[in-house]
């Protein structure tokens, strides 16, 4: 299998993580156990996941002209990701995610900052790179008109797209049509498409269900791929790891095989702290799959 060329158009954030035993209710103050800042953002996370798994990855995004922005760009470059399409925005803060981590679960508030400047005009400067991609990954932490523009462009140029519709937001009908694959989690799928997505949409859906695995449709027949049982430390980046790994594996076999590979990568990712901290290499995923019976 040739090394895939993957372009990620999406968010780049600094994750500000507070670890606590108790989640405060309204008006309550509780003591936290620890505080950490770690690189994140759904776009950047998926880019790192794909790069760790051996893909050639380009990130298209924006950061603030601030200390966080410099750290975030350097972090991507350190992972081998092409960053000449990540440019700072003057007089704007970098995107930030405030994460409350408790009992190995998480709650997240995202402040978009420079991610709001990932506009169609900005991305249009990289159309040549988009057209040369094997897979383009998108999420919904950047302006929705940009997502719709990229999906339309890629559909016209026969480039495979994976749209991770998180956080769940409505897009024009044409955007869903233009996407090759749509990868919501169970809650996002229900919010966006209801209990019974139409037949055309079902063929695109790769629905993640946490510990219950992944569900998709093949020739209108429901297929369920079980998850791998592990003891999680931090689930923050599991979905992003899944999406990056799914994009990497798409060119090497069936959708079911790509989902199983992505499930294995996600299982490994939750065993370390931080969205990117536990993202595995291709060798680690292959070794894990062998241990699990191939």
Curated annotation (Swiss-Prot):
Report the superkingdom from the record.
Bacteria
Q: Which Gene3D superfamilies match?
A: 3.40.1190.20
This protein's major location comes to cytoplasm
The entry summarizes how activity is regulated as: Activated by a monovalent cation that binds near, but not in, the active site. The most likely occupant of the site in vivo is potassium. Ion binding induces a conformational change that may alter substrate affinity.
Required cofactor names: Mg(2+)
Pathway info: Carbohydrate metabolism; D-ribose degradation; D-ribose 5-phosphate from beta-D-ribopyranose: step 2/2
Annotated catalytic residues: 240 (proton acceptor)
> Which residues does the annotation say bind ATP?
185, 208-213, 239-240, 263
- SUPFAM superfamilies per the UniProt record, alphabetical: Ribokinase-like
User: What's the Enzyme Commission number for this chain?
Assistant: 2.7.1.15
Q: What is any one GO biological process for this UniProt entry?
A: D-ribose catabolic process
Q: Which GO terms describe its molecular function?
A: ATP binding; metal ion binding; ribokinase activity
Q: Which InterPro entries match?
A: Carboh/pur_kinase_PfkB_CS (IPR002173), PfkB_dom (IPR011611), Ribo/fructo_kinase (IPR002139), Ribokinase (IPR011877), Ribokinase-like (IPR029056)
N-terminal signal peptide:
none
Subcellular localization, as worded in the UniProt entry:
Cytoplasm
Q: What does this protein do?
A: Catalyzes the phosphorylation of ribose at O-5 in a reaction requiring ATP and magnesium. The resulting D-ribose-5-phosphate can then be used either for sythesis of nucleotides, histidine, and tryptophan, or as a component of the pentose phosphate pathway.
What subunit structure does UniProt give?
A: Homodimer.
Designated name of the protein = Ribokinase
Q: Which organism is it from?
A: Halalkalibacterium halodurans (strain ATCC BAA-125 / DSM 18197 / FERM 7344 / JCM 9153 / C-125)
Gene it is expressed from: rbsK
